């Protein structure tokens, strides 16, 4: 009867073949025999949709009981979707030659709601190889506590001026997280260890870190969002009092927002930004491998990977490269290259110059649109605008006679792409053009990425 209070009867589930019942039931804000609450009904539906385990549009069906009109039975009618993804990537640069990678991710592992991720990356030159494994449990023992464990191993040829041979990195750790006040705001802490070993140097590095973070996430789908915000702020404290021989603090802020511009959710605008700052602690210098370098499909497209790397990066040195002929002790002549900005610097001043930055900022704006009126079109277009830069220590700019960039002094690029959605996944073709090309730089760059579902 309209106006009378109603109570929840049975909460039933249909259509879950792989997903276990308790994984679904723990997302219900409504409970059996409690007073019906429209807000809790909406939140329950949002929780199920945001899992990413089911086709979008999950609705809890309500049906009154015969002879008990104040009792409502609820039915979650589900249709499971693919929860495994793979991503393959291939590229080329003067630094690493041909490179590639493969990432496999299985969500809802064995129907438990857990996620397992495996990845491998390689490069033709510089002996680059990297392997990662991560296991995530979003609801430990069906509680609101989330946890993850991870481990990785990588090998790469030292490309810095230190020439320390092959660098082997072994890292491992775990994290725990919990909601703060409401569902979308979470606090988490990660404890990690990293051992960086060199074949041609005895100065091995051992990092022990703790990273508290606050995250807000309201996106409506974990893989293909069309609305919502995802943002986080974290502080990564390395060294004292956690051990190791590196003292370092890093601040990181990330922001991403999605807007659906039409009713069918096919015209989507995405804005993203990130900022990072490295701070020396005590007398421990910032390791070269931890300094910021940007460029490529994940930051500023149209640039080679990590080619934007401060006033003494490879890209900047090419701009000021000059040649001179020197005669060695045996009387043989050799042609040497040098940076014209460093010719009057002393040995101690040269040691202050380092590739990479201690701060970074990256901004991305994307518009994804269909090529036809059919909302199920499998071909989507993309236009984008990227901007970003890194800054090094002020002393480096002074030594090189350069002006330190302001926050909004950025390298910029724009471009377009096509994404082909197939039953096996998404093919991405993206072309980026530099909007501020320098004399020695190529004007553009094409990149191809394969990502998919299984």
Residue ranges of model-derived segments:
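Gram-negative/organellar outer-membrane beta-barrel architecture
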Residues: 18, 29, 34-232, 249-251, ...
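N-terminal export/assembly leaders
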Residues: 20-25
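Extracytoplasmic gating/loop element in the C-terminal half of outer-membrane beta-barrel translocons
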Residues: 72, 262-394
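Flexible, small/polar- and glycine-enriched "cap/hinge" segments at structural transition points
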Residues: 144, 179, 381, 386-388, ...
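Acidic, glycine-rich flexible loop/linker segments
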Residues: 241-242, 250
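Outer-membrane beta-barrel transmembrane domain signature
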Residues: 268, 388-414
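Short glycine-rich, acidic/polar surface loops and turns
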Residues: 366-368, 411-419
